[in-house]
């Protein structure tokens, strides 16, 4: 009996869950290389939910490598699976997401029921539909700097890797039926655990009528197949298929992969924990006579409070994430306890960045930390950041968003230095990396249209005019700013100046925003003004430039 997937990674003596998983793997004294596996059907645009499995495996692999083990991290593209439904959205290899109207959706519909690797790539750039979406997932791993070996199920079948285990399952068909009946309704006495591919129409069918293991063949009729709430029509062809011309059903294919690849550990979502894992464990032990790998359940993510769903379009890709986050911040997100459901909130992404920055400072012992937090930083940080360097600078994310209001690189650096976020002795590489966060924060502000989504009109003053009272009040405020007050004092003085000149406060704020942004709204004015070059602000409020 394998370990409880809900308990693996829960070791109380370890601050980092990946170390607890590594303990469980080592306890089995596995052969080397230790194999860590994940997998997914390349059914459509891969998102951060699919990436969960890669990252959980990555951290366990790194924990084992730290202990001197040789580790192979593989990820199977379950690309011999049939296309069950036409997706709502697709993406090209540059991550441009398109609707079905921009590709030949009819071709996809005509290929329902066929393996992903037998369906033409809608964009015409890869060998197949399956190859296209596997390539996107592989690119995701490369973007984050995670080295994963991708394995095609279709190729494993074609190369005969599945043949021996498929034969064994069919030899033990009675035993396979008894096991499956524990987890699935309506397992008929004539059920055969093999899905041939029709030689006529190319669809994966279920209508096996006879098995000849001496010849290594099955006879079949291409029947209709239920796929969710729809039926995929069979063509009625009667034929013969070899054990390479088809596939095992999922509940048998998954444990077969464990045997073929020699898998020692596999993480999976809670949907599998309550369905596929118990049956897979049973099949492994009682049909294949192998030991299942060490399992671990991870919780799903939500996106801005809603379930990730490709069908509903509520997804975010790794490429989109890296438009607003450094790769190391995204990797840090997966350091967190996998057993807790977490929300990936784009709107509040600044909080995740701030949390990462504190995590980094704990590693360099720049801030106090609890014993567990200090141990977690010590263990995980070198896995998150490829090149730990104490001189690295992190500009606070929301401040970086403020800097993003101007496109002037020199001004960005000037303001950051003025506010103390870039030390005088900072090396050039550290300054360059620190300011690179500005572009991401600027993209975040634009994406969420938040309070930082404004453009400072520095080059020339917007075309604005004010009545005499407002003009006089702006001159008074300019004099106050020239005295060198901080943001809080300036914010307070804005109210006082409006009051002295009998001006509506909202209109006075609008006057300031119009001068700076050519807009009637903006960030907290006093705080923002204090971050800018004082001479520029004074001259702008005096309408001199």
Curated annotation (Swiss-Prot):
The family database entries (InterPro entries) matched by this protein are listed as:
aa-tRNA-synth_I_codon-bd_sub2, aa-tRNA-synth_I_CS, aa_tRNA-synth_I_cd-bd_sf, Lys-tRNA-ligase, Lys-tRNA-ligase_SC_fold, Rossmann-like_a/b/a_fold
Q: Which residues form the signal peptide?
A: none
Please state what class of enzyme this protein is.
Answer: ligase
Q: Single GO molecular-function term? A: lysine-tRNA ligase activity
* Pfam families the record matches: tRNA-synt_1f
Sorted UniProt keywords: Aminoacyl-tRNA synthetase, ATP-binding, Cytoplasm, Ligase, Nucleotide-binding, Protein biosynthesis
SUPFAM superfamilies annotated for this entry? Answer: An anticodon-binding domain of class I aminoacyl-tRNA synthetases, Nucleotidylyl transferase
Instruction: List its EC numbers.
Output: 6.1.1.6
Where found, per UniProt? Cytoplasm
Where in this protein would one find the motif 'KMSKS' region, according to its record?
Answer: 307-311
The terms describing its cellular component in GO are: cytoplasm
Kindly state the positions of the motif 'HIGH' region in this protein.
42-50
What Gene3D superfamilies does this protein's entry cite?
Answer: 1.10.10.350, 1.10.10.770, HUPs, Lysine tRNA ligase, stem contact fold domain
Q: Name one GO biological process term.
A: lysyl-tRNA aminoacylation
Reaction catalyzed: tRNA(Lys) + L-lysine + ATP = L-lysyl-tRNA(Lys) + AMP + diphosphate
Top-level lineage group? Archaea
Question: What family classification does the UniProt entry report for this protein?
Answer: Belongs to the class-I aminoacyl-tRNA synthetase family.
**Record protein name field:** Lysine--tRNA ligase
Phylogenetic lineage? Archaea, Methanobacteriati, Methanobacteriota, Stenosarchaea group, Halobacteria
């Amino acid at each position: 009996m394998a370990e409880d997937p809900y308990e693996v990674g829960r070791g109380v003596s370890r601050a980092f869950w990946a170390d607890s998983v590594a303990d469980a793997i080592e306890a089995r004294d596995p052969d080397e290389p230790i194999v860590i596996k994940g997998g997914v059907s390349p059914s459509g645009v891969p998102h951060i939910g699919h990436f969960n499995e890669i990252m959980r495996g990555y951290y366990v692999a790194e924990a084992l490598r730290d202990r001197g083990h040789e580790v192979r991290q593989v990820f199977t593209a379950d690309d011999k699976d049939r296309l069950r439904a036409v997706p709502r959205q697709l993406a090209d290899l540059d991550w441009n997401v398109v609707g079905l109207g921009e590709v030949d959706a009819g071709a996809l519909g005509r290929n329902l029921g066929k393996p992903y690797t037998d369906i033409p790539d809608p964009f015409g750039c890869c060998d197949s539909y399956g190859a296209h979406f596997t390539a996107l997932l592989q690119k995701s791993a490369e973007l984050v700097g995670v080295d994963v070996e991708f394995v095609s199920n279709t190729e494993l079948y074609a190369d005969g890797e599945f043949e021996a285990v498929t034969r064994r399952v069919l030899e033990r068909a009675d035993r396979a039926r008894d096991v499956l009946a524990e987890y699935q309704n309506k397992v008929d006495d004539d059920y055969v655990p093999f899905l041939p591919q029709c030689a006529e129409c190319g669809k994966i069918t279920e209508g096996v009528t006879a098995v000849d293991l001496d010849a290594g063949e099955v006879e079949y009729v291409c029947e209709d197949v239920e796929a969710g709430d729809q039926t995929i029509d069979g063509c009625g062809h009667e034929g013969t298929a070899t054990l390479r011309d088809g596939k095992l059903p999922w509940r048998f294919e998954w444990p077969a992969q464990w045997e073929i690849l020699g898998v020692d550990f596999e993480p999976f979502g809670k949907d599998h924990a309550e369905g596929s894992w118990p049956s897979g464990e049973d099949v492994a032990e009682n049909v294949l006579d192998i030991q299942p790998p060490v399992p671990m359940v991870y919780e799903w993510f939500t996106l801005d409070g809603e379930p990730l769903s490709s069908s509903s379009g509520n997804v975010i890709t790794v490429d989109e994430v890296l438009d607003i986050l450094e790769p190391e911040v995204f990797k840090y997100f997966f350091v967190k306890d996998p057993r807790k459901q977490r929300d990936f909130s784009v709107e509040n992404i600044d909080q995740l960045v701030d949390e990462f920055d504190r995590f980094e400072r704990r590693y360099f012992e720049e801030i106090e930390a609890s014993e567990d937090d200090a141990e977690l930083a010590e263990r995980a940080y070198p896995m998150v950041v490829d090149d730990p360097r104490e001189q690295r600078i992190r500009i606070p994310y929301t401040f970086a968003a403020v800097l993003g209001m101007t496109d002037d690189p020199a001004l960005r650096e000037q303001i950051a230095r003025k506010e103390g976020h870039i030390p005088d002795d900072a090396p050039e590489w550290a300054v360059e990396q620190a300011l690179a966060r500005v572009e991401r924060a600027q993209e975040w502000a634009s994406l969420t249209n938040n309070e930082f989504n404004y453009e400072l009109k520095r080059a020339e003053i917007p075309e604005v005019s004010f009545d005499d009272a407002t003009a006089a009040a702006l001159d008074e405020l300019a004099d106050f700013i020239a005295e060198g007050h901080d943001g809080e004092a300036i914010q307070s003085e804005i109210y006082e100046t409006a009051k002295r000149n009998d001006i509506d406060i909202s209109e006075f704020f609008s006057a300031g925003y119009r001068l700076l942004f050519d807009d009637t709204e903006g960030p907290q004015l006093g705080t923002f003004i204090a971050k800018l070059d004082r001479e520029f602000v004074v001259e702008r409020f005096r309408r001199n430039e």
